[in-house]
């Protein structure tokens, strides 16, 4: 999981109920935690 994410703030709501600063951060977290986290919708949860 060598993903480098920008600090751009385009929040997305993950299927784990958490708001991520952008889709890259969600994808990176899913990879490092070995969980299947998907984007439920754009914006905060």
UniProtKB/Swiss-Prot annotation:
Protein name: Turripeptide OL11-like
InterPro entries: Kazal_dom, Kazal_dom_sf, Prot_inh_Kazal-m, Prot_Inhib_GrowthFact_Antg
Disulfide bonding pattern of the chain: 1-31, 5-24, 13-45
Signal sequence bounds: none
Keywords: Disulfide bond, Ion channel impairing toxin, Neurotoxin, Protease inhibitor, Secreted, Serine protease inhibitor, Toxin
GO biological process, one term: cell differentiation
Gene Ontology terms: cellular component: extracellular region
Molecular-function annotations in GO: ion channel regulator activity; serine-type endopeptidase inhibitor activity; toxin activity
Biological role stated in the UniProt entry: Acts as a neurotoxin by inhibiting an ion channel. May also act as a serine protease inhibitor, since it possess the kazal serine protease inhibitor signature.
Places the protein is found: Secreted
Family as reported in the entry's similarity comment: Belongs to the conopeptide P-like superfamily.
SMART domains in the cross-refs: KAZAL (SM00280)
Top-rank taxon, per record: Eukaryota
Domain (Kazal-like): residue spans on this chain: 1-45
Residues at the site labelled Reactive bond: 7-8
One Pfam match: Kazal_2
Tissue specificity annotation: Expressed by the venom duct.
CDD domains: KAZAL_FS
Annotated domain remarks: The cysteine framework is IX (C-C-C-C-C-C).
């Amino acid at each position: 999981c060598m993903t480098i994410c920008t600090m751009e703030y385009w929040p997305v709501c993950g299927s784990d109920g958490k708001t991520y600063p952008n889709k890259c951060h969600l994808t990176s977290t899913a990879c490092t935690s070995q969980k299947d986290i998907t984007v439920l919708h754009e914006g905060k949860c």
